[in-house]
Amino acid sequence: MRTRLATVLAAAAMTGIVAFAGPAAAAPADKPQVLSNWTQTSAASYNAWVSARGNQGAWSAYGFDWSTDYCTTSPDNPFGFPFQTACARHDFGYRNYKAAGSFDANKSRLDDAFYADLKRVCAQYGTVKKASCDSTAWTYYQAVKAFGFSAAVDGTAVA
């Protein structure tokens, strides 16, 4: 009797586990559109991404990779220019498009969005300092255009 009762209880417990263990949650169907919206060259795209980054929990169902090494081996704030957030968004684009298997098709736009972000940083400065910032931004942009692909292939992001 005890053996039979133990078997029935074990079977009931397993049924409960199976019943509550439902299928793994898939990312929402609009994930590619959200990713695209957050990686465009416009200020609106940048601002939407910054807002989402500040509230990542609201986007957890999408499974985005928010990790960043900022500007990789380059200074995050060269000569005092705050490029860190632009680098973080660039990393976001590289990492998530690589995970989606569509990095090659989007790399150029991601690099252009990075440059647009850097230019927006530079726009806040007066003529002389802006020229220096713009020159530094151009250098960072050329670096990601030239070396971003190889870095994305080996698992790091160059931003």
Model-derived segments and spans:
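Extended terminal accessory/targeting regions
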Residues: 2-9, 16, 20-159
